[in-house]
């Protein structure tokens, strides 16, 4: 809740890629994500390497997670992020069949590997720029601290924080299902 409170206070938006088991743990957050203008996407059911699944297991995982999101919010997600960024042709085909765009990242502060908010913030502040997609996790206090401090620093420099779909639209990128996007920088 602290992350959502901080985003709201700063007028910042985010895209949250959700695991099924986490949605079950925090059902109240689902409605709040949408009420406050955030975007939701599929991560997986239990955070597994999607490339290791059979086509049937993959379909069950992706469609099942999407269905959970739809049942809780009324919206079918059009974005997905494979755990660890691991994807192959099978994952891309399934994403296309489910109508999902595959979103990776261009800045990874490795917040999942450390509990040092200063280190995470330093990496993000050094690497983040216009059109970047920043990978972060909302499961630790240090990640939330770093995210909110980064938003403060970059907003002071004129940056704004928007959802992935809004970023693509602002940059004139028409995303297509089954395609992979790491950033939306001017090429």
Predicted feature locations:
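Active-site beta->alpha N-cap acidic-glycine motif
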Residues: 1-53, 57-75, 160, 169
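A broadly tuned preference for mixed-charge, low-complexity surface segments
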Residues: 45-48, 63-69, 133-140, 152-161, ...
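Conserved, mostly hydrophobic/aromatic
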Residues: 7, 16, 40-43, 65, ...
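Structural recognition of alpha->loop->beta junctions
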Residues: 35-39, 73-76, 128, 178-187
């Amino acid at each position: 809740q602290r992350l959502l409170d901080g985003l709201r206070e700063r007028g910042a938006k985010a895209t949250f890629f959700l695991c099924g088991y986490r949605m079950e743990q925090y059902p109240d957050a689902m409605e709040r994500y949408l009420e406050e203008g955030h975007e939701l996407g599929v991560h997986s059911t239990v955070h597994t390497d999607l490339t290791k699944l059979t086509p049937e297991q993959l379909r069950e995982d992706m469609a099942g997670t999407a269905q959970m999101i739809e049942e809780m919010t009324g919206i079918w997600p059009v974005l997905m992020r494979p755990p660890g960024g691991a994807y192959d042709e099978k994952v891309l085909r399934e994403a296309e069949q489910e109508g999902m765009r595959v979103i990776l990242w261009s800045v990874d502060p490795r917040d999942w590997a450390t509990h040092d908010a200063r280190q995470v913030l330093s990496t993000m502040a050094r690497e983040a720029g216009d059109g970047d997609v920043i990978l972060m996790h909302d499961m630790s206090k240090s990640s939330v601290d770093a995210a909110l401090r980064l938003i403060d620093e970059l907003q002071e420099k004129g940056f704004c924080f928007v959802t992935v779909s809004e970023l693509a639209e602002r940059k004139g990128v028409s995303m297509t299902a089954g395609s992979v996007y790491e950033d939306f920088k001017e090429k």
